[in-house]
């Protein structure tokens, strides 16, 4: 079923799942619920990652495909992750688990960007996605 979703739809799914996960995590759920939240993390990561790959495949010229993926990895796994971890750690130290709610902000920004992408992007054909 993922093959039927556009890059923007996958990014929207990932952003929505991330907002839900951070919001629920901030409520200090019981241990058993954290397992379900980690599954939601897997869904939000996978949807976002696949959404980017499909977006790049459709939007980035072939000769820059590796560069596009490298920039995404450097930003998402490096700079942005380091900043998010530092900010989250600061709020966690002061607010406990409620500090995780601050992570809703970057997730919401990503969701807003994905919705904007959905509104301005052309729809790739099924052949272009596969």
Regions found by a protein language model. Give the residues of each.
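MFS-fold secondary transporters
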Residues: 21-25, 41, 114
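Symmetry-related core transmembrane helices of the 12-TM Major Facilitator Superfamily/SLC fold
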Residues: 99-118
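Structural signature of the two symmetry-related core transmembrane helices
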Residues: 9-24, 104
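Intracellular juxtamembrane helix-capping segments at the cytosolic ends
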Residues: 47-61
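Intrinsic disorder in cytosolic terminal tails and internal cytosolic loops
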Residues: 117-130
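A late C-terminal transmembrane helix in Major Facilitator Superfamily
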Residues: 66-95
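Helix-to-loop junctions at the C-terminal end of transmembrane segments
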Residues: 1-7, 92
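Helix-loop junctions at membrane interfaces in 12-TM secondary transporters
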Residues: 26-37
